[in-house]
Amino acid sequence: TVMAVGKKAMMMHGKTHEHIKTIIPLRDGVIADFYAAEIMIREFIKMIPWKNTIINYSYRMVIGIPSGITEVEMRAVHDSAEQAGAKEVKLIHEPMAAALGIGIDVLDNTGNMIVDIGGGTTEVAVIALGGIISNKSIRIGGTELNEDIQDYMRRAHNLSIGERTAERIKIDVGAAIPNIENPPEPIEVNGRDIITGIPRSVHVNHEEIAHAIDKTISKIEDTVISALENTPPELSADILQNGVYLTGGSSLLRGLDKRLSSRIKLKVQLGEDPLLAVARGTSVALKNFNKFPFLI
């Protein structure tokens, strides 16, 4: 029996008893549990407000995938969508979806660089003429940052915290650099003392978190540099002019744009509503199901 899906299920994560199990169907941007992924898609379909719509079960579906995905992983995404009831399925690489989602004309001959930092992967791509010219994909994203924070809390404060608490810390006081304008107030974090086993709280500030996630942010920067090194000169000129666009939930980390800009010596800007960029772009692709040449 499925009790909850999405946010409601996430609220239960780490709090369940033996008769309830929370499952994360996707890991590192790909399907980790085929059956759970199929159920999740089915439940999401049920959430669609079908008002003023003739209910038609021959669904068309567009799904975002990491650009570094294997053929087998791609097939798994395709199959799970079909098992959930989709009749026509197309896949879109997430950097392409992110570009569409922030309003870039991806069919134009001007090159644009997208850095999409999702939950399981970071995608860096140079896009022009409806294609991905140069791309790098690493299986590092928001989840890895949460793990860094959990690890730091264990080492620095002898405090064991759950994944959801780490996510809240990242959102409330997360920063990519210690020196930021308008720093957030320190927050109180509750967890379990590793030595005594008793619940305890500590205060955590943005400087601590900047230190905790520093190595992972450096890996993301290295990936951006690697993609720039593989970009043709004509497109490099476009990127110099247009800058680099950041999308994805973890791009909202305070000071990340400034840190990346000082490392690559290019203008770095946050895309509009970066958290929903890929979802919005996938929606644009769905409306152009048979028009866009880059849908797989």
State the predicted function of each range:
Residues 1-117, 125-245, 251-296:
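Nucleotide/phosphate-binding catalytic cleft detector across ATP-hydrolyzing
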